[in-house]
């Protein structure tokens, strides 16, 4: 081992000149520098920043006296002079000073005590980091040795492997004999240790995580991103990729054989016939061979025909289906993609938003029976041929509403594009099927081709209205030969398994003669038409149809009243039994929800007469007056054919229901406004499909009356008390007059014209006529009538919102409560609200008067605004005290004083006053004053007030339609409307921003019962049906208190409106609703 010669001089010449930079002086006392033997500068420059080559730490011997080690810019650690001397550093170098044997005292107290230089943690860190690196050790005699640094001892003895003496001039590599395996240099001999090309940061400068590697642009040594080449797949078939034909990856067998034979003399024994593996059959023409062949074929047939073989093969092949088809493939059976018909979607879940979007396109949805949840029955497509079954021709355009002949006047036929019929099966007796009303909603077009008059499929599909709620079958009574809307439209909602009927051509059905019952053959044919129905369903439907045909009878009512009460809405599944019944077959729809005739068509329609005359204006005697939403005049006796009404439930309902003393006799020639009294509230909150609840959407220009149809089927809204009506479906409503509308499809925003099935003079709004004819409704008419708030088309995008006013905390209004006809005010471009404040006809005091007022909110349409407040206040309107007002003969539509929101002026206290201004309740007894306050406050219970903000409403219709008529007050949704005396919370009010009153009030309501909406003024209004069952003097409110009301409300499927606190005068309360 080479020993460096002892030092002759106190300091080495190689040491740099002294510098002030880093002095690591060991205090005389023998203690180490405060930082552990390292001068201050080192702390900040532990590793030189320069390139790795520049950082080459060197170690020098540490004098026993305590010299330090310095690390220079070149990484040199030089031995330091004895203690008296300062240890200098070359310029720019950091010094690492450490005294041998010193304890730094740096470590935590509990750490073990190391000997010697091991206590200098920083120096030890650097030295261990360079283990394995090449180092040059310079000893005191000036010789330099090169080797690989291996380790060091606590006394700073350096062990170096593969050491050889480094020549002054590089003369190639060292010779083998000059290399010493290991040398230990004592600290006393070492002057300088130099490590070259050391990178202290190599372990920390890069990240080795997957993400760091993936982010590194240098992937697999490539610095640029790989350019993707387009894959040219060639033919989709895989013939080109057969392994046998692809020789690109190897030798052709023949080439190999040839190569081996030529180069190695090896001849292949390969035989393509593989004779060594198989026994070739030698075919010959001998008789014996042929007999063997025949015998083999016979055996094969026997084997293949044996049950065991077949069973085994069937198990393997499973009817020709592969494993993938059996276990993983998505099977889509049914009609083609083009048809959204129910049938094609049998069994498939369709998300609600999609159902809503597609409903108008004609996708038929069965109403689902689950939970009474309204199913959307698909509306007939807007286009003539959207229904799968509907005939594509123009002829198909004529659709009878509710299967009624489509001949009705355009007015009656006002298409309701947006309306969706929902049927909630839950209410139906299990036997019943509910069919969403035919696209009453869908536009009705006069039948262009006779063929479109296919008889409407029968009631089988026709859903019966839930008990107690009359389904406004067709808003207008339409002679419906088959009471059923297209079966396709309706689905059978009865408890019986829901069967969606495929929509049959609605038009076809409707065009058939209204009164005539479908013959069984026809029924079968229709059923057969429905695509995608399973046989089971078809059988079920046929059964239902036959049963219906056999059992369907018009039930004459001794008086219109009787007819109304006796028939639960359900009853109306009329399928006119025979042509003789055609007349009867026309059902009057009691849109108001007179439960009895819910499906009945207007009596007038019932006659075999052609359905409504095409002209909106003409009112054929045959045609019933356009049914006002409330109109369902009591159906003429016999009008209502309870189709297979469940006798039990019907009887029950009949017992429960009371006749409407105010009902007028039905005169087919007169337009008739039937009073719909919801005999019972529909049991299920779910929207009904029966009525064709169509909401006409009027185009902006048109002023629409509410169409007779209500949007009764709107999916119910499930509301928690806090919930706002979430589900309003926005339907565009147009204001066009019914007569006007029938002719064209509604403009984009408008719904197909609603039909006023009853023929009423074109001029009179159907509601008015109906109201006049029917007299005040006893009970809220169709439970469905729900308000449909729509916004003028202007704000199509906005959801209509109804917000409850805070003022009426106690009573949320429930859509269900509003049973009165929903008045749809459509707003055209101008939202003029025509509110007929006039109370909807109020029957005598004994009858509850419907209270709902509709205030339009017209904002921004100053000119129209006036209507809201007709200047003429009608005293009658003022709800004074509890005196019920009998219907006013023709209260002006706006009865309120200009300043005030119109209140229904029934004598009864109604909570639903709506003041355009702030809703401050004033006792109903107070006449509405210009003051902002509404009389509502006087009600014993606060009624929830809802304001609809016009702008907010995007033609939305709340689902109130579903709301059963059940008066909320009744604890049970199903409960029949309370009889007079029962308190109902009347409630709906719409607030609209106060409008300037300057405008003339728009059209007075000819009949008090129905608010007249001037056809001309289009305005969007949310209408809220009035609960008609209310009795004057009744305290609004549910028997059970607010919670019960809410619960009831939910049961009723109504929309619960919370209260809006602190509305300022002029503020709109918005009705909130969602799909």
From Swiss-Prot:
GO MF annotation list: cadherin binding; mRNA binding; RNA binding
Tissue: Expressed at high levels in thymus, lymph node, spleen, fetal kidney and adult testis. Constitutively associated with MPL and EPOR in hematopoietic cells.
Signal peptide: none
Quaternary structure, from the entry: Interacts with MPL/TPOR and EPOR and dissociates after ligand stimulation. Interacts with DDX6, G3BP1, and ATXN2. Interacts with PRMT1. Interacts with CIC and ATXN1.
SMART domains: LsmAD
Name of this chain's protein: Ataxin-2-like protein
Residue numbers spanned by region Disordered: 1-115, 316-521, 551-697, 733-770, 820-849, 865-940, 1022-1045
Membrane topology field: Peripheral membrane protein
Presence of the UniProt keyword Transcription in the record: no
N-acetylmethionine: modified positions: 1
Phosphoserine modifications at: 103, 111, 238, 306, 335, 339, 391, 409, 449, 493, 496, 557-559, 563, 594, 634, 674, 680, 684
Residues with the Phosphotyrosine modification: 118, 264, 309, 349
Chain intervals with Polar residues compositional bias: 330-342, 421-433, 874-898
Basic and acidic residues compositional bias, start-end: 316-328, 505-516, 571-584
Region (Interaction with MPL): 98-121
Organism expressing this protein natively: Homo sapiens
Alphabetical keyword list: Acetylation, Cytoplasm, Isopeptide bond, Membrane, Methylation, Nucleus, Phosphoprotein, Ubl conjugation
Positions of modified residues (Phosphothreonine): 632
């Amino acid at each position: 081992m080479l020993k460096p010669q002892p030092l002759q001089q106190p300091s080495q010449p190689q040491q740099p000149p002294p510098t002030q930079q880093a002095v690591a002086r060991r205090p005389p006392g023998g203690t180490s520098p405060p930082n552990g033997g390292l001068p201050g500068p080192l702390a900040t420059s532990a590793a030189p920043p320069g390139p790795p080559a520049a950082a080459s730490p060197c170690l020098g011997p540490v004098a026993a006296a305590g010299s330090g080690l310095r690390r220079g810019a070149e990484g040199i650690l030089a031995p330091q002079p004895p203690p008296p001397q300062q240890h200098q550093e070359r310029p720019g170098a950091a010094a690492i000073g450490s005294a041998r044997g010193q304890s730094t005292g740096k470590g935590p107290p509990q750490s073990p005590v190391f000997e010697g230089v091991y206590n200098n943690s920083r120096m030890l860190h650097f030295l261990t980091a360079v283990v394995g690196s090449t180092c040059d050790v310079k000893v005191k005699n000036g010789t330099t040795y090169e080797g690989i640094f291996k380790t060091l001892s606590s006394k700073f003895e350096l062990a170096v492997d593969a050491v050889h003496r480094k020549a002054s001039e590089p003369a190639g590599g060292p010779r083998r004999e000059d290399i010493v395996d290991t040398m230990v240099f004592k600290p006393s001999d070492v002057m300088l240790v130099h490590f070259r090309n050391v990178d202290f940061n190599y372990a920390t400068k890069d990240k080795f995580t997957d993400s760091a590697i993936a982010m590194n642009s240098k992937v697999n040594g490539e610095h640029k991103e790989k350019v993707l080449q387009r894959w040219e797949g060639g033919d989709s078939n895989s013939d080109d990729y057969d392994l046998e034909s692809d020789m690109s990856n190897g030798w052709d067998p023949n080439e190999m054989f040839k190569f081996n034979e030529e180069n190695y003399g090896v001849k292949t024994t390969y035989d393509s016939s593989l004779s060594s593996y198989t026994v070739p059959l030698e075919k010959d023409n001998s008789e014996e061979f042929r007999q063997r062949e025949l015998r083999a074929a016979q055996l094969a047939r026997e084997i293949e025909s044996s049950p065991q073989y077949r069973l085994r093969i069937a198990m393997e092949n499973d009817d020709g289906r592969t494993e993938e088809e059996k276990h993983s493939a998505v099977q889509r059976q049914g009609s083609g993609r083009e048809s959204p018909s129910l049938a094609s979607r049998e069994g498939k879940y369709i998300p609600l938003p999609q159902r809503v979007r597609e409903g108008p396109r004609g996708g038929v949805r069965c109403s689902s029976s689950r939970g009474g949840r309204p199913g959307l029955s698909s509306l007939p497509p807007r286009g003539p041929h959207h229904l799968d079954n509907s005939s594509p021709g123009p002829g198909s355009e004529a659709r009878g509403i509710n299967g009624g002949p489509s001949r009705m006047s355009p007015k009656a036929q006002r298409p309701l594009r947006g309306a969706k019929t929902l049927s909630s099966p839950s209410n139906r007796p299990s036997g019943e099927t509910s069919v969403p009303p035919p696209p009453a909603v869908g536009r009705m077009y006069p039948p262009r081709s006779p063929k479109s008059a296919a008889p409407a499929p029968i009631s089988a599909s026709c859903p019966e209205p839930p008990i107690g709620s009359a389904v406004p079958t067709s808003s207008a009574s339409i002679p419906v030969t088959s009471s059923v809307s297209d079966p396709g439209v309706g689905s059978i909602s009865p408890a019986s398994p829901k069967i969606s009927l495929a929509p049959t051509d609605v038009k076809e059905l409707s065009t058939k003669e209204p009164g005539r019952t479908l013959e069984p053959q026809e029924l079968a044919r229709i059923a057969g038409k429905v695509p995608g129905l399973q046989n089971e369903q078809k059988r079920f439907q046929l059964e239902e149809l036959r049963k219906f045909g056999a059992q369907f009878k018009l039930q004459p009512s001794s008086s219109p009243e009787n007819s109304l009460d006796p028939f639960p809405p359900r009853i109306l599944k009329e399928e006119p039994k025979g042509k003789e019944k055609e007349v009867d077959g026309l059902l009057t729809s009691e849109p108001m929800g007179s439960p009895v005739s819910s499906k009945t068509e207007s009596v007038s329609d019932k006659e075999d007469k052609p359905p409504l005359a095409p002209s909106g204006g003409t009112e054929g005697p045959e045609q019933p007056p356009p049914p006002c939403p409330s109109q369902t005049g009591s159906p003429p006796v016999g009008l209502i054919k309870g189709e297979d009404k469940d006798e039990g439930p019907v009887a029950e309902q009949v017992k429960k229901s009371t006749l409407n003393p105010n009902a007028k006799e039905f005169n087919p020639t007169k337009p008739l406004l039937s009073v719909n009294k919801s005999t019972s509230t529909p049991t299920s909150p779910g929207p009904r499909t029966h009525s064709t609840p169509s909401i006409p959407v009027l185009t902006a220009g048109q002023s629409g009356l509410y169409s007779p149809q209500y949007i009764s089927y709107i999916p119910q809204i499930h509301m928690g008390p806090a919930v706002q009506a979430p589900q309003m479906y926005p339907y565009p409503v147009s204001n066009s007059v019914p007569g006007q509308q029938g002719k064209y499809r509604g403009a984009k925003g408008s719904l197909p014209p609603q039909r006023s099935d009853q023929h009423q003079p074109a001029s009179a709004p159907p509601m008015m006529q109906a109201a006049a004819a029917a007299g005040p409704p006893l009970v809220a008419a169709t439970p469905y009538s729900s308000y449909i708030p729509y916004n003028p088309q202007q704000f199509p995008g906005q959801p209509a919102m109804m917000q409850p006013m805070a003022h009426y905390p106690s009573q949320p209004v429930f859509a269900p409560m509003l049973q009165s006809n929903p008045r749809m005010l459509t707003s055209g471009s101008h939202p003029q609200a025509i509110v007929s404040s006039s109370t909807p006809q109020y029957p005598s005091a004994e009858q509850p008067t419907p209270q709902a007022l509709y205030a339009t909110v017209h904002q921004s349409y100053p000119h129209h605004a006036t209507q809201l407040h007709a200047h003429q206040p009608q005293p009658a309107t003022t709800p004074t005290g509890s005196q019920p007002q009998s219907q006013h003969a023709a209260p002006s539509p706006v009865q309120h004083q200009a300043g005030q929101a119109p209140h229904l002026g029934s004598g009864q206290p109604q909570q639903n006053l709506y003041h355009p201004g702030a809703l401050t309740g004033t006792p109903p007894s107070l006449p509405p004053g210009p003051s902002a306050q509404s009389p509502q406050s006087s009600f014993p219970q606060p009624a929830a007030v809802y304001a609809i903000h016009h702008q907010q409403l995007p033609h939305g219709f709340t689902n109130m339609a579903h709301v059963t008529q059940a008066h909320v007050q009744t604890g049970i949704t199903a409960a029949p409307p309370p009889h007079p005396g029962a308190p109902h919370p009347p409630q709906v009010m719409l607030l609209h921003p106060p409008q300037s009153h300057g405008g003339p009030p728009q059209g007075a309501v000819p009949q008090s019962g129905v608010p007249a909406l001037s056809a001309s003024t289009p305005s969007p209004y949310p209408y809220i049906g009035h609960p008609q069952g209310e009795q004057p003097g009744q305290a609004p409110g549910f028997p059970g208190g607010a919670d019960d009301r809410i619960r009831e409300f939910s049961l009723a499927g109504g929309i619960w409106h919370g209260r809006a606190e602190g509305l300022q005068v002029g503020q709109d309360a918005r009705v909130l609703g969602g799909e």
